[in-house]
Amino acid sequence: LFYELYLRSFYDGNGDGIGDLKGAEMKLDYIAKLGMEGIWLLPIMQSPAYHGYSVTDFFAINPIYGDLKDLRNFLYGAHKRELKVILDLPLNHTSPSHEWFLKALDGEKPYRDWYLFLQSEEWLKARRHWDNQQVWSNYSGRWVYALFGPGSPDLNFESPSLWQQIKEVLTFWLSVGFDGFRFDAAKHIFDFSIEKGICEYQHSRNIAFWKEMTSHCRAISPDCLFVSEVWDDARIVDMYSSIFGIGFNFPLAEDLKLAIASRNAVSLVKALKTDMQRFFRSRRSYESGTFLTNHDMTRLVSSMNGDRDLALLALTVLLTLPGLPFLYYGEELGMEGVYDEYFNEEQLEPHLWYENGYGPGQTEWKALGKNRPHSGVSFQAQSGIAGSYFERFKNILRFRRDNPWLRFTTIKSISRKKDLVRINLHGSKGNAFLYHNTGSSRATLDTAGTPVVINGTLERLRGRWSLAGLSSAIEVLNE
């Protein structure tokens, strides 16, 4: 179980209203007690952007988060609690205020070669793959390739010296104590064809680059963890994930949420068969990074139209599937936030510790929008309250933590009877049956065994097991 952590919004350790490394260190027990085994730390490098994905210095910590000593203390505390920590590295591009880019604009070598300058007027016709937007930005009269907009000019990996520079970046952060990396925009390293003058993914070249970078890291730290962000179809995801060892399963995240939100057992069965079968075809080469939400997506409760019982059902389905789960900060509280491609602060809102929105450690860099004070989603309002969303969420996490064998199971079959979905798993404990009731009415389980409830209500009625609506149970055989 990994916890995706956005420092700015999490916990303030010095009273300036901005989350930081000291604050995160103070809340490591909170993360560990949730049942987490690792932390995915969003970018902490110097950056003018609130999200941190446009970097001005790959070797420096954003001073709002602290310094190198603070980072070492945070990592020491995490490792003391047996929490691994991976750093999110956006290596595809920089900020236009990065020293490399400023020197490139001045024509200084080798920096000029580290960015792609316009070489033909025909290139200006190139458009972005997903929305047909312009990919060239003008900086003081010079056109530079910037796929993600003028705030993020792309690095040009045609330059061998840039490859060496990136290796130095990786070496530095490993030496500080990180256990690995989440690589942002992994398929975008080579995504413009100089020969054709168009945007075109060059997957074989990208994979060659990542092979060299991951090999470099593993030579330093053999147990280094890598997670790739490749938002694409199954075939492409497989290609990249086999290099990194863990690949995010985006199709599963999207399809699972849609099926649960619509209370559609037929869609859930289809999603699980389609998205998990793809994973098992490549099981020998990588592990599925399972998740429901992240910083680029609408939060879980919002995707369930505010229905927290549906959100908990989606979580239970996810955490009973094979793979390595990643959970986004604040989801344990039921925080809300709707994704906007051009303004995603809403799903990066401050983690709400106190019901009135104020108190020691509460971050205040952004006014609370969806999660207004007195909304009932704060840690203070829910902690220790039986039946609260937080306590139910935590119980589901505890179930997964207490059953690590689920991570390496194989799905033998998936079936449905009305609103009840049954999944047959095979793992180190033998065979197991999972039952998920996607409907509102009770469902009778066809079993002579003794299932155990994971979430919701399971009762023995008239000699048979009855699973309440939006509830889940498991029956382990041959243990």
Residue spans of the language-model regions?
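A structural motif
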Residues: M36, F178, A186, G323-L324
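C-terminal beta-strand-rich structural cap/linker in extracellular carbohydrate-active enzymes
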Residues: L461-E479
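Core domains of carbohydrate- and sulfate-ester-processing enzymes
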Residues: L102-V144, S262-R281, L348-S375
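Short glycine/proline- and charge-enriched loop/turn segments
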Residues: G52-I61, K196-I198, G245-D255, N344-E349
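Loop/helix patches that line or flank the sugar-binding groove of alpha-linked glycan CAZymes
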Residues: T214, R218-I220, W231-D232, S241-I243, ...
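Beta-strand-rich binding/interaction modules
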Residues: S441-L458
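Acidic/aromatic-lined carbohydrate-recognition and catalytic surfaces
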Residues: L1-K167, T171, S175, H188-V237
